[in-house]
């Protein structure tokens, strides 16, 4: 069956997840024009599809995304994580339970190297730790690859899902994935709204829209001082036929 003929997944809300989506705050000016409301902590396990994704690309794994893996138990999983402190847990956890490949490098807009800030036991960032003033963290140099230099369309089983959570580096990951986006059926990206040194949310939309993606859902959000600082946006291509 050709890729075009494969059934395309459609992301739906579970009734319970829908009830949990009580409106608390409107999005700030960066995304208010989209006319969306903010979800109040709905995890990735609330995603449903008619057929299930066959390939999941988890970029910025850290300790893993178990709710996402559990939702699609038959999917092949590609794990992308440059921070070595997370490898033992991944190798004794999800990699023993599932069909996975661990890619021990960062993803970005160009191939090369970058400085990774190890911001504690649960976080790492290529953008530094400006949001943690007065604190210092160890740094290491890690390799960086473009996603579309690592995987080709022919390497993916369809439907395929791309999830990105890279602590403010999401735009660069998408810029390095453009040649692969035609083979991706849905994208979940953590979008940051309050980091002046990161990107504008509109830039995420500008990359995905030309490839036919539309914003269809908003999952878990982070709110600080009654302002949304980041949220998980779900994009997919409209169903046809």
Question: Predicted regions span which residues?
Answer:
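Phosphate/nucleotide-binding beta-alpha loop and adjacent structural elements of enzyme active sites
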Residues: 2-241
């Amino acid at each position: 069956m050709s890729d075009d003929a494969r059934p395309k997944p459609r992301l739906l809300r579970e009734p319970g997840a829908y009830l949990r989506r009580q409106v608390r705050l409107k999005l700030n000016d960066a995304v208010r024009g989209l006319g969306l409301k903010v979800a109040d902590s709905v995890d990735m396990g609330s995603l449903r599809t008619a057929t299930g994704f066959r390939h999941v690309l988890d970029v910025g794994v850290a300790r893993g995304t178990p709710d996402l893996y559990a939702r699609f138990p038959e999917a092949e999983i590609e794990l992308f994580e440059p921070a070595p402190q997370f490898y033992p847990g991944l190798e004794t956890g999800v990699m023993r339970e599932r069909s996975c490949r661990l890619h021990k490098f960062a993803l970005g807009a160009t191939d090369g190297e970058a400085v990774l800030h190890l911001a504690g036991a649960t976080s790492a960032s290529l953008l530094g730790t400006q949001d943690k003033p007065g604190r210092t963290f160890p740094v290491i140099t890690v390799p960086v690859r473009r996603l579309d230099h690592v995987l080709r369309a022919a390497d993916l089983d369809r439907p395929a899902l791309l999830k990105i959570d890279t602590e403010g580096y999401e735009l660069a990951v998408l810029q390095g994935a453009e040649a692969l986006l035609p083979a991706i059926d849905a994208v979940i990206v953590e979008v940051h709204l309050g980091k002046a040194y990161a990107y504008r949310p509109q830039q995420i939309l500008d990359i995905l829209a030309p490839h036919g993606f539309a914003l269809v859902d908003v999952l878990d959000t982070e709110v600080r001082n009654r302002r949304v600082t980041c949220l998980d946006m779900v994009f997919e291509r409209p169903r046809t036929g």
